[in-house]
């Protein structure tokens, strides 16, 4: 597994399965156990079963997991671990297999025996999946026999039965999510593939295979429906993969690991020439997007080590200090800790609360990173030079920020000249259209409902923030009006509570230039105002492509297919009826009434909300599309060209 092996404590049999409470509540309140009954909850069912298999891998008894999406969106998870115990569990007098799948908080994760580390959702995984499945079948290969149980919505439909002989060990779970419980029953292969790849990186040497066997996927190339992943380098390879579209400052990934008692910590990091930090932290294989004690320990140690090293080699004066943020500019880092009693804050495990892990990670990084820098002075100087440059840029950004604040304080609410604000002051009721060009801005201003709609026209070439530091952003005359109009600051100082509008709508033409402006703005929001996207405040307006007129009747269409359908409908079955069809060449060519009717009227318009389902994937996409490297961008365009909208103007 990791370079420091995680071993099982005691035997894994029925005595290690401890019952805490019943299953009744799960179907009543599924959100308490899997977060939601939306698509994310649907996928969470798979993660729970896979987590159980990974617990066997962590204990040193499993090196292969296979996940299949079968026809009908049935899931099958197979592992070659020891198999769930089938002997009688003393506390209940029932087979341990039955207890694991029918009793909440039953598993080898409680009571001091069984697993030392475990990632299952507070030990409720298997039974919750069972409760929320239309049907579930589990087969255990153990002691030369195949033991099978069947369930429906948490109830036993077939008692544990021996159905055959076997020469292997392991568990196979097959289940179909219950349509009574989930809004969406279709699995996204890429979502599952991303999660399985993550698990494979975090558990060096574990092979995870995922395959899409659904009929709708049969004609897809194998590269889009089957992946087999095994990374002997573990999180080292994870960092290399995360940095693949970036230019690394040093060729080797810095790897550090250590152990105290039953707790293990691994850290892998590499700097690149970009300006953004990417830190992914995990506890018992569970991603902790809000960080926690392991991240705190790492950040503190990194800042101290770099400052001490800088003073030692005289790149820093004794009274100089580089901030933690500057030390992390261009950093890609993966932190993985494994511990017995993981204390996650919140049911969704977003943050790790164990204070002893902060000390462990701090000590490991303080010791091993210091040694690395001593042995690799050239790399040390490059990292410090980057941090010092970031420090100078941050100071310039601070001065620019203070200058803006002073001007605002002297001149009142110094809103941008071109902003046409609305009358309403409640941000929950207001929206701002960020519009490309003065002509479209003029039509939008005349066509809007000024009670709640504000207009901010943008003009000229916008800054690509993927290639710029914060000081350049503050001084940029194209982005400054956006920052000022929204009123919530940027970067670490961004405060959603100060936002002046809760709908930020990007309105640009449906051509190449419009797409470029949209992408530049989204890159800016992602890098400097990410909570804006995370809170669901960012939208893209979808203007129509066609106007169809018959006499005094006018309709619009958003695609070629819709144009043909609307045209046929307006003819009413008479092919001789004349329909005038014109194509909107751009927002600037629409008159104010047309713009209101098609793109701004809340009753009729189409808005596309920008979401952030996968921050890592979004990070990678922005780096590819807007970064310095040409080759990854070329590959991305070639791979995704089939999904692009056909633009002929």
Residues covered by each model-derived region:
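Short conserved segment of the HATPase_c
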Residues: 84-107
